[in-house]
């Protein structure tokens, strides 16, 4: 392997492990190989067990407000490292303007969910679901539903076009909900996800087992999921449907959230003729959507 190629690392069961390096990743501008990624030899079942026994156990004991403060602290930390992320992002083929929505937008997601957690959720490790129900005539027997974290792990399979936003918007949700995560970024741009992940771990803000990273194949991880796990997929419809219909997903009734082949649409009303403010705004937004990230946006 060329000395100019950097081997990425996976974060597995609390340890940074150098990738097996079977997949070369190339600079989007020069075409030169710059990184090597891979997950050969990974103990996927062990990763899930680690997340469930370590991360889940700690997160589910925390209140929503504690989790929200954790997200805010993480956002503040990552905000101080943005310039590093932008420098790495150029190798993905993105300009600073392209990466603004990815990097600043991703960190912004952490701030938003931190705020929602403090403002909209109770300072408890559970959420009341509805009002108490009187189950006996004199009120000696009362029932109350509550929502609590699942006891499994959230597995995130992400797309290539938002290596930072795609990760941060998903982990913000699962961490606030009290679940650990395993992040599997798209290999094409996973080197940017990796550098952000290193800052997440270096911050020491997240509890042990709350976050793991795979820069390469997901292997047979989905063969080890159960009904307490969640899989969140962003990518093509064909790949998403293939994963969603895996026997392990279906037989264990695993929650599977899929965002696939998403397209944006701009509609101009017939009364918005050239020369109107609406027409000018329409043209401006269409140009933006066609040029930012070369049109590879999904929001």
Which residues make up each language-model segment?
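Short coil/turn connectors at secondary-structure junctions
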Residues: 6, 148-153, 177-179, 207-209, ...
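Conserved small-residue-rich beta-alpha loop and adjacent elements
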Residues: 122-204
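Flexible, acidic loop-helix segments that line cofactor/substrate-binding pockets
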Residues: 87-104, 219, 261-264, 271, ...
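ALDH superfamily catalytic-core signature
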Residues: 202-204, 229-230, 239-299
């Amino acid at each position: 392997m060329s000395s100019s190629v950097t081997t990425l690392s996976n974060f597995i069961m609390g340890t940074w492990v150098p990738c097996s390096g079977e997949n070369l990743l190339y600079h989007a501008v020069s075409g030169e190989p710059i990184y090597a990624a891979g997950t050969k030899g990974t103990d996927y079942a062990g990763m899930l067990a680690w997340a469930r026994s370590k991360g889940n156990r700690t997160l589910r004991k925390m209140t929503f407000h504690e989790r929200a403060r954790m997200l805010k602290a993480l956002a503040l930390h990552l905000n101080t490292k943005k310039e590093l992320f932008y420098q790495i992002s150029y190798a993905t083929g993105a300009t600073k303007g392209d990466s603004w929505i990815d990097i600043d937008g991703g960190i912004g997601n952490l701030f938003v969910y931190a705020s929602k957690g403090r403002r909209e959720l109770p300072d408890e490790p559970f959420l009341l679901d509805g009002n108490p129900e009187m189950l006996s005539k004199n009120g000696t027997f009362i029932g109350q539903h509550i929502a609590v974290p699942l006891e499994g792990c959230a597995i995130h399979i992400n797309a290539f076009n938002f290596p930072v936003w795609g990760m941060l918007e998903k982990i913000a949700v699962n961490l606030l909900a009290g679940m650990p995560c395993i992040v599997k970024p798209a290999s094409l741009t996973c080197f940017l996800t990796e550098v952000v992940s290193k800052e997440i771990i270096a911050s020491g803000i997240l509890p042990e087992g709350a976050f793991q990273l795979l820069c390469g194949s997901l292997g047979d991880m989905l063969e080890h999921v159960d009904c307490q796990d969640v899989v969140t997929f962003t990518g093509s419809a064909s790949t998403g449907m293939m994963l969603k219909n895996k026997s392990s997903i279906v037989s264990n009734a695993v929650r599977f959230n899929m965002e696939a082949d998403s397209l944006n649409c701009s509609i101009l009303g017939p009364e918005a003729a050239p020369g109107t403010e609406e027409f000018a705004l329409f043209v401006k937004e269409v140009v933006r959507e066609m040029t930012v990230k070369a049109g590879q946006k999904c929001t």
